[in-house]
A protein has these predicted regions:
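Conserved N-terminal phosphate-binding loop of PLP-dependent enzymes in the Aspartate aminotransferase
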Residues: 1-445
Length: 445
């Protein structure tokens, strides 16, 4: 095994892969703690509001993980021998399944499938819907394989592979440009501008337009549309929130038109909103749920509407599958992480700390003309900046001051901290934002 000095790491990355855009630091895997990331080269500490793009539930080196010898032994077992979970049963995976069902799996979504990667979770949710819709059509006497289109929203991000390329359409066109895509129905995303009370009429108007577009597509493609998919809260597209009334209207349309409703909670799921799933706060249960990131291993949950056809993909062996069936190391890690989440009541912490973060962001919008539309559920918070260039400069200045925050949408800042973050750490990060704002007082908004 090659041992490199920290100073050599960026050179090796640059020599072997395209490292453009990576943070100018080398993460110290051992010294970093919680939401404090340590640069192995400089020794500088960074306050982490990035959370490895919303995938870190506990932050770095949580003591209940690092000091748990039994958990470490299980991790070592899984790391030394990479098992094909789809074919071999292990006590390690069984333990994870029990914990996942207890903590994360609603009785409303009894079927589960696991795979590595959020995009592949979405892909398999779509495959489940295609199979279901085609079987529905065959039962109606439609002899051809019809029912393989997906209704989706503008400013969606569902991944960068296969089917998902036809759905992803955020502000960065290079994520999908020149790759082949399907011509699937896309409707307006009637995102809320906050405070909602001041923008309700506009939001309701956009909802009406979106629903009319959806109805029009169902009128001309009813037998073709297998599902409606949306992120319960759009992440990459701009941290866009939707009213429960709109989600319920989509649910009603799906029921009326023999289509399944899929929620993509790869980014907004697993506790960041203050409940394990964001949909639990909104009163609308999906038929299929794609998950990942903080759950460590990704996958799909499914509800009873799948049972309207025989031999759907969750009961017929081999219809959806992969060699690794997820990743056993991720499952073993997730098993203990979910237990720690319960022990430390981190859903409650995400809700209360998120409320504090949102209060600080609302105060920021009142203090500076460069900020508006503060929004959030739990710790999944964001705020708009008056221009993209200003947003990008602001993020760069924050990094220089030791705070890592990331952007989304056209000109928004998003916050994705670990669920363990404290009030003091939130204040420290927002105080840095407040300090760098005056530097931009003469910039073009």
């Amino acid at each position: 095994m090659i041992h490199l000095r920290a100073e050599q790491v960026p050179q090796v990355f640059g020599r072997h892969i395209n490292a453009t855009g990576m943070m100018p630091m080398v993460l110290d895997m051992r010294e970093s703690q919680g939401v404090r990331l340590i640069d192995k080269i400089s020794g500088n500490s960074y306050l982490d509001f990035f959370g490895f793009f919303a995938s870190s539930m506990l932050g770095m080196n949580h003591p209940k993980l690092t000091s748990d010898s039994e958990a470490f032994d299980r991790l070592t077992d899984a790391a030394v021998n990479k098992v094909a979970n789809s074919d071999i049963q292990t006590a390690h995976m069984a333990g994870f399944l029990e914990t996942f069902y207890r903590v994360a799996q609603s009785d409303a979504l009894p079927y589960a499938f696991f795979i590595s990667g959020g995009a592949l979770a979405v892909e398999n949710a779509l495959k489940a819907a295609f199979d279901w819709k085609v079987r529905k059509n065959l039962a109606k006497g439609i002899s051809l394989e019809r029912g393989q289109q997906v209704m989706h929203l503008r400013e969606a991000f569902h991944g960068r592979s296969g089917y998902t390329l036809s759905l992803t359409n955020t502000s960065d066109p290079w994520k999908t440009r020149y790759f082949p895509k399907f011509d699937w129905p896309r409707i307006l995303n009637p995102k809320i501008t906050f405070p909602l009370s001041e923008h309700l009429e506009d939001v309701e108007s956009m909802e009406a337009q979106a629903l009319e577009e959806a109805k029009s597509f169902f009128l001309t493609r009813k037998d073709e549309i297998a599902c409606i998919i949306l992120e319960t809260i759009q992440g990459e597209g701009g941290d866009n929130h939707f009213r429960p009334e709109f989600l319920q209207a989509l649910k009603d349309l799906s029921l009326e038109n023999d289509a399944l409703l899929i929620f993509d909670e790869v980014q907004c799921g697993a506790g960041i909103t203050g409940t394990f799933w964001a949909w639990e706060q909104l009163g609308v249960t999906p038929d299929l749920l794609a998950f990942g990131k903080k759950t460590q291993v990704c996958g799909v949950l499914a509800g009873p509407r799948l049972d309207e056809v025989e031999d759907h993909v969750f009961v017929k062996p081999g219809r959806i599958n992969s060699t690794w069936g997820g990743n056993l190391v991720d499952m073993v890690r997730a098993d203990r992480i979910l237990e720690i989440m319960e022990e430390e009541i981190l859903l409650s912490n995400a809700a209360s700390m998120g409320a504090h973060l949102l209060n600080r962001l609302n105060a920021l919008t009142e203090e500076s003309e460069h900020f508006s539309n503060a929004r959030g559920r739990g710790l999944m918070c964001a705020v708009d900046v008056s221009s993209r260039s200003l947003r990008d400069d602001l993020l760069s200045r924050c990094f220089e001051q030791g705070v890592i925050i990331i952007g989304c949408g056209e000109s928004s800042i998003r916050f994705r901290p670990a669920l363990t973050i404290t009030r003091q750490e939130i204040d420290e990060g927002i105080n840095v934002l407040e300090r760098v704002i005056p530097r931009f007082s003469n910039t073009i908004a």
